[in-house]
Amino acid sequence: MLRKYYRQYGNDGYVLLMDYSKYYDNIRHDKLMDIFRSLPIDETSLWLIKQSLKRDEIDVSYMTDEQYAHCMDEVFDSLKYQSVDKSLLTGEKMMRKHLNIGDQLSQIAGILYPYQVDSFVKIVLGCKYYLRYSDDSLIIHHDKDFLEKALEQIRAKAKEEGLTLNPKKTRIVKLSSLWRFMQLQYSLASTGRVIQKINPKQLTRMRRKLKKLSHKLPADELTRLYNSWFRAHYKTMSRNQRANMDNLIKELTTKEK
């Protein structure tokens, strides 16, 4: 997509990066069921989906009547919910939004759920260079003013679907700068070259993971795990980063346990 944009506008332009706050926590069951009903799915499968969603409902009996009346419009955070006094969870008030990350239904829902926003961006706003994966999306455009106006309209459309754009992760930056999307850092050079760099935080996480696993896995198994990860990421790493990671795995697999 970046190369296609470059052929038309060069590297002069901007990218609007968007992220939904607590995405899976705020997927509404009623709207999700409307999406599934619009698809060619048999009644038995729809019933099973409905039962699965019922298990994901959140007990919010601790809320006041006024809070409960507006809970579907407020951002829900399952991490903060863990600190709620369990004695207050009586089952009297259930909130029908939130999905458990990891199961098959949540993976499918994560792809499907914002399709109304997708259609709005592509058809109503006419954005040609638009991309979304789960809760991360971007729009590339040569006009910054257009993106600023589009952002406000997208924010309102997302709100209709029960979603809220994360103010810390939603921003407009120049295409020629270094910006992050889906754990990679990108930049569009004046030559048309698409620069991709691994997120340094991802390297830090992998180093910690390897050190932790080095006490649990045999050297050959740890090496296989590392090699698999390295093959998937080495093209986005600098020479120094590759060398540092290689040195780490050698150190971890040769030391005495």
Give, region by region, the residue ranges found by the protein language model:
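Juxtamembrane/interface motifs at transmembrane-helix termini
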Residues: E66-A69, E160, K168-K169, M245
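Conserved polymerase palm-domain catalytic core
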Residues: Y5-S134, I139-K149, S238
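Right-hand nucleic-acid polymerase module
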Residues: Y81, D85-R96, N100, S119, ...
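Beta-rich nucleic-acid/ligand-interaction surfaces
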Residues: M1, L138-H141, I172-S176
